[in-house]
């Protein structure tokens, strides 16, 4: 099974941007962790990051067309993008929303997600391990 792992705005700055909040793992290191865990679980992870909402939408549409599960950390677009929510609603395979930090323990505006109502599940506040937990969940589901 192919799993699309999609990271949104500012996640390319992991390891440099607010390491006290997001940790010191870089996006390249995160991608390597995800790819290794996926392989160990018999999955193939395609890990991508973009600061462009349009590109994220294209990737979500592609996953919907291919009936592929998505692990999505939309960054700040989580709290603002109806367009991203609508694209995610089109997915028939599972959508796991992941956030590295505990968004519920931060600023008020971060506590609302347009994505959660259309997600299969949500993992928040467990650092980069949240991605690996999402993969383990998907590996346990029938293809």
UniProtKB/Swiss-Prot annotation:
Q: SUPFAM superfamilies attached here? A: Type II 3-dehydroquinate dehydratase
Q: Which GO terms describe its molecular function?
A: 3-dehydroquinate dehydratase activity
Site described as Transition state stabilizer, located at 17
- InterPro entries to which the protein is assigned, alphabetical: DHquinase_II (IPR001874), DHquinase_II_CS (IPR018509), DHquinase_II_sf (IPR036441)
Do you know which NCBIfam families this protein is assigned to? aroQ, PRK05395.1-2, PRK05395.1-3, PRK05395.1-4
Query: Family assignment?
Result: Belongs to the type-II 3-dehydroquinase family.
Q: HAMAP family, alphabetically?
A: AroQ
**Could you tell me what this protein is called?**
3-dehydroquinate dehydratase
Q: Origin organism of this chain? A: Mycobacterium avium (strain 104)
**Source taxonomy lineage?**
Bacteria, Bacillati, Actinomycetota, Actinomycetes, Mycobacteriales
């Amino acid at each position: 099974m192919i799993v699309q792992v999609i990271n949104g705005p500012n996640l390319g700055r992991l390891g440099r941007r607010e390491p006290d909040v997001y940790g010191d793992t870089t996006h390249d290191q995160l991608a390597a962790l995800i790819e290794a865990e996926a392989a160990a679980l018999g999955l193939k992870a395609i890990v991508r990051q973009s600061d462009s909402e349009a590109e994220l939408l294209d990737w979500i549409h592609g996953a919907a067309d291919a009936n592929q599960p998505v692990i999505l950390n939309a960054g700040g677009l989580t709290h603002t993008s109806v367009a991203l929510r609508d694209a995610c609603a089109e997915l028939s395979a599972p959508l796991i929303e992941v956030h590295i930090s505990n968004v519920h323990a931060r600023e008020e505006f971060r506590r609302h997600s347009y994505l959660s109502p259309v997600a299969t599940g949500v993992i928040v506040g467990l650092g980069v391990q949240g991605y690996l937990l999402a993969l383990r969940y998907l590996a346990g589901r029938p293809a």
